[in-house]
Every structure is written in C-alpha cells, then in structure tokens.
C-alpha cells in the first residue's frame, strides 16, 4: 500500500502531483493507495480524481486520519513531508519513503531532515517545486515497483535505529530537570 500524506493539514502540491499520475498509478493492479489529502483539500482532490467505483476500491481518500499509527503500519511505501514527527513515525517502522520537504518550514529544517535520510539510503527526496518533474515520477515508481529499492531503504532505516532511544531521552529529560 502506498500512503500519501502531507501532515495533519495536507499538502496541496503533493496532492496535485499524485493526482496527475492517477492513470499510471492505477495501471498497477496490485497497488492500493491511501491518500490523506488534508481536510481543506479533500473535495478538490475527490473532484480532480473522479474515481470510478472500481478505482475507489483501490484509492482511498481521507481528509484526515486520527489512527495514523495503524495506517503507517500498513504502508509499504510513503510519500510525505519531512517534519520531525512524521519522520519519527516513519523511522520507527522503517518504511521506505519519498520525502517532500515543506519549502517554508522554519530554517528549512525539513530539507535538513530529508537530506539526512537520503544520505543514509533510507529515502528519496524531491523538492516541492519539482513535484511535476520526470524525476519525481521516476523516484515514485522506483519506490513502488522495485522491491530491491524498498528493501535497501528498510535496511538503511533499521541501521539508523537505536534500541537505546528511550533511555537516552530519559537521561536528557532528567538532566534538564535536575539542572533547574
């Protein structure tokens, strides 16, 4: 399953880029898509896709998803923004991803986040202003179609994980609390 989302409010450019590839995505008979558009974008995306009943069985549109953990756990691949919370969730589950940093994020931190993932081999990255490009399409379909690409990303993501994260975080919290 391909999960597409842009954070809790959605991401219009991601929505538009994925909608533009509707026919090519649906040409893959085993591909199911869960597309979380953002509440304000749901009607526009629904209208733009104009899914038939058969297509709607494979392309599930939601304005918002409050059970994101379960949705992420079901994903084989993800297209999303590169915010810290999204990446923490994606990382914990080692899900292959195509990251699209939000270009107006403070200090461009989402690009910094995504770049670290790309350098480790755990994700692809595409700048927001290049979402309509052939490169976006090539990366998306490599993610969907090539099991070895996904397997490599999973292995890279797992190599980044630490089993000591909770203990390290607790040490920081205790250190800050006792310094007061």
Labelled PLM ranges:
Residues 96, 122-123:
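Residue-level detector of anion-binding/catalytic polar loops
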């Amino acid at each position: 399953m391909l999960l597409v989302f842009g954070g809790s409010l959605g991401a219009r450019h991601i929505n538009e880029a994925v909608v533009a590839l509707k026919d090519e995505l649906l040409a893959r008979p085993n591909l199911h898509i869960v597309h979380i558009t953002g509440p304000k974008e749901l009607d526009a995306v629904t209208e733009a896709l104009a899914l038939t009943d058969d297509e709607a069985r494979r392309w599930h549109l939601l304005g918002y998803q409050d059970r994101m953990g379960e949705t992420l756990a079901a994903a084989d691949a993800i297209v999303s923004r590169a915010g810290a919370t999204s990446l923490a969730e994606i990382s914990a589950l080692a899900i292959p991803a195509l990251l699209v940093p939000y270009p107006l994020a403070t200090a461009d931190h989402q690009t910094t986040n995504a770049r670290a993932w790309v350098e480790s081999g755990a994700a692809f990255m595409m700048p927001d202003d290049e979402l309509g490009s052939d490169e976006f399409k090539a990366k998306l379909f490599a993610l969907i179609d090539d099991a070895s690409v996904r397997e490599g990303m999973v292995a890279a993501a797992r190599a980044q994980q630490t089993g000591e994260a909770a203990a390290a975080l607790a040490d920081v919290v205790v250190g800050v609390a006792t310094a007061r």
